[in-house]
Amino acid sequence: MYLEVVQPYIKQGLIEGIRLSTRPDYISVAVLDTLKRYNVKTIELGAQSLCDEILTLCERGHSVRDVEKASSLIKEYGFSLGLQMMVGLPSDTLERSKQTAQKIVSLGADNTRIYPTLVIPNTKLAEMYYRGDYRPLTIEQAVEWSAEVYKIFIQSGVSVLRVGLHPSEGLISG
């Protein structure tokens, strides 16, 4: 198991703990028991949205309830909770993104990451884009929406670890 590799570094005090990211529907008592044994400190969930309509349309494979249950378990186990969100997913609106941010706060997130939705070739989202069923946010909209949810997090004491993605090849601009 990969988590074993870093244990000597933790024992020597060179590393404090481990941060990892996973899907909300992967979290269970058994998984959390294992992660606790391996000195995991922070678990980030790729929630992306807390609107079931958006999650279904994007075929995320998890529901808002999955995020709620996983978040509750993570906090109950004493882990730091990170919840990642995306702005501009199919059927998203600025209001829905703000509601997702407020829900992330109410779930007790310690930190978050805000990502604008980007179209990557050979994905379901790219198919939707090419069919005309999805229109990505403009740069201006992505900045505005990200700023709005950022304010919600900062005013609520939730640490924002990142806004946006590193540029990379293969993205389709909107």
Mark where each language-model region is:
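Conserved non-cysteine loop/helix-boundary elements of the Radical SAM core domain that shape
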Residues: M1-I114, P121-E140
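A general secondary-structure junction signal
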Residues: T22, P116, R162-H166
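Auxiliary Fe-S-binding modules of radical SAM enzymes
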Residues: K124, R131-G174
